[in-house]
């Protein structure tokens, strides 16, 4: 695609109102155009052949063939960048996470028809996601039951009732586009006694709880949505809720999680920079910072602050990123001690931890 060519977008949604609104938003952007719309996947299949779109926006739930079935077939036969369009429901969030496992690049929530408040922000986010998707590295759908096999090999870790109450070592992770699958790949190999993990992943409210529950069924550590004021424990991962910044703080000898409803930073709440900066302040050399795939620059400055505070820092390499935005910016600032392929990230992090020593206080 040359610089003068617009990004061609095919919108698939069973609602004529949503198709019209998405078309209006996309066509208002100078660098993209809706080449066609479809009310269901069967019509979309023919339009893909005719128009060869650069990006597909795909409704999660539709008649005749649902979005997941269509996505799975599409990513096996003709992989292309797909942005899922999902409702803000528990079922919608679970289906969307499955779509990301199947190879969708990203997702947006459905626009609220008839409500103009917030529409400019929505339009900006939609356009950003389409631009990122058009440049994304698309991967084929995994083999059937691959994720289920991973779950079987890593049974869910129980929440600890009488836990270790303090650890000096922490793993701090930030991600955006493509991050849900990257985070899964980093977390699943971690042993049950791994240090606590704090995660900021760009996600809207309503999705992070389902994301945490899904990971908890795949990992040997316990994974949960972070709660304000809770003690940060080894063998646990804490995911920032979609409506709040996650910060690390200290209470005596212990780390605690704090949530903040302060305004977005780098247009995001939760923000990776907010989490990384709090880790630089309160954990310093006892933390490891990891920046994964994602568009934009959120987390780049924060990773550099962690490094300057003595933390060892990792950035995902370009070849394994869905979108090489946030890691690229962090590397350009000099914030990354190591640049690592995603498949090696967990092993390299644990190897680094082994050189840092292990001092854990029991009660």
Curated annotation (Swiss-Prot):
Instruction: Name the SMART domains on file.
Output: REC
Keyword check for Membrane? no
**Primary location class:** cytoplasm
In the record's own words, the domains note is: Contains a C-terminal catalytic domain, and an N-terminal region which modulates catalytic activity.
Residues at the active site: 176, 202, 298
Modification sites for 4-aspartylphosphate: 59
What does the PTM comment state? Phosphorylated by CheA. Phosphorylation of the N-terminal regulatory domain activates the methylesterase activity.
Give the EC number: 3.1.1.61, 3.5.1.44
Q: What does it catalyze?
A: [protein]-L-glutamate 5-O-methyl ester + H2O = L-glutamyl-[protein] + methanol + H(+); L-glutaminyl-[protein] + H2O = L-glutamyl-[protein] + NH4(+)
What enzyme class is recorded for this protein?
hydrolase
* Protein task: Involved in chemotaxis. Part of a chemotaxis signal transduction system that modulates chemotaxis in response to various stimuli. Catalyzes the demethylation of specific methylglutamate residues introduced into the chemoreceptors (methyl-accepting chemotaxis proteins or MCP) by CheR. Also mediates the irreversible deamidation of specific glutamine residues to glutamic acid.
Stated name of the protein: Protein-glutamate methylesterase/protein-glutamine glutaminase 3
SUPFAM superfamilies given in the database record: CheY-like (SSF52172), Methylesterase CheB, C-terminal domain (SSF52738)
Gene for this protein?
cheB3
Q: Name one GO cellular component term.
A: cytoplasm
A single BP term in Gene Ontology = chemotaxis
